[in-house]
């Protein structure tokens, strides 16, 4: 009977995840139709290209972290305090890994677009700038939202994702209507700020979740560095953009290395990887 009950709850969970995934796809499809009708087919291509860059490279990091993070969170799912500690730890590590990459992305996005596509796609830079800032909020909300899966609350997970998809679509429609492609980047940032507030309050009310002081410190420092990078690309002319940008990237890398070393011993990990390559 216990096995049947567990199997049933897993089936319900799987169904809810699939359903929320379907709603996300429908929202993305409706947005593409709107862009095509309001703007043109070229803008649909530009939109897809911009978010492919962001989602592909950042998504790889999320996937790699998720394979290790979800099983560990599932083990402590019944203990709210341990869940809180693990979510904070994962949020810290996600930010420490992502922040230098995102800041480098802000500074060198033009080159990335030209290398991956062509100079004809440079009209998406504004959209990518704003969306890159949104990844900071996506990373943290991603770490929190996993707790709904770990605790097996399928309905809560579904409604959380459902409302997220609804306002993501609404903000994207408004963003494109009033701001074109750049407006889509701004709407991405706003949507993930709201989504983070949403998952934080659900986790706080249901599981007494709160952010640790060390997480807040990392978030503020790395986000301020990213904001400085954002200001540099918007306000300062080349080649000074790259000079100041490299300084910001260097500081972010140094800070991330220092913090990661105290948490997971990153120096030993790097040495281990290098030794494996030497043996090959």
Language-model-detected regions and their locations in the chain:
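Interhelical loop/hinge segments that connect adjacent transmembrane helices in multipass membrane
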Residues: 1-28, 68-85, 206-220, 266-271, ...
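Alpha-helical transmembrane segments of multi-pass membrane transport and lipid-handling proteins
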Residues: 61, 87-138, 169-177, 234
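Short runs within selected transmembrane alpha-helices of multi-pass transporters and secretion channels
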Residues: 20, 24, 28, 51, ...
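Hydrophobic alpha-helical transmembrane segments in multi-pass integral membrane proteins
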Residues: 25, 169-173, 224-239
């Amino acid at each position: 009977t216990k096995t049947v009950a567990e199997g049933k709850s897993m089936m319900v969970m799987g169904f809810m995840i699939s359903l929320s995934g379907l709603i996300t796809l429908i929202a993305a499809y409706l947005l593409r139709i709107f862009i095509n009708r309001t703007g043109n087919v070229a803008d649909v291509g530009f939109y897809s290209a911009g978010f492919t860059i962001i989602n592909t490279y950042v998504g790889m990091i999320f996937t790699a972290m998720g394979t290790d993070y979800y099983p560990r969170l599932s083990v402590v799912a019944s203990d709210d305090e341990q869940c809180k500690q693990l979510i904070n730890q994962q949020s810290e590590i996600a930010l420490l890994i992502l922040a230098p990459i995102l800041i480098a992305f802000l500074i060198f996005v033009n080159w990335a677009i030209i290398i991956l596509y062509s100079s004809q796609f440079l009209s998406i830079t504004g959209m990518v700038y704003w969306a890159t800032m949104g990844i900071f909020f996506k990373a943290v909300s991603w770490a929190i939202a996993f707790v709904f899966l770990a605790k097996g609350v399928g309905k809560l997970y579904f409604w959380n994702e459902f409302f997220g998809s609804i306002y993501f679509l609404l903000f994207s429609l408004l963003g494109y209507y009033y701001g074109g492609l750049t407006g889509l980047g701004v709407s991405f940032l706003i949507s993930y700020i709201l989504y983070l507030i949403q998952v934080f309050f659900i986790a706080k009310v249901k599981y007494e979740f709160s952010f640790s002081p060390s997480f807040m410190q990392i978030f503020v420092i790395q986000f301020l560095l990213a904001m400085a990078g954002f200001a540099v690309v918007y306000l300062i002319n080349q080649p000074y953009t790259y000079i100041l940008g490299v300084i910001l990237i260097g500081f972010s890398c140094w800070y991330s290395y220092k913090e990661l070393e105290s948490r997971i011993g990153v120096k030993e990990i790097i040495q281990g990887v290098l030794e494996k390559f030497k043996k090959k």
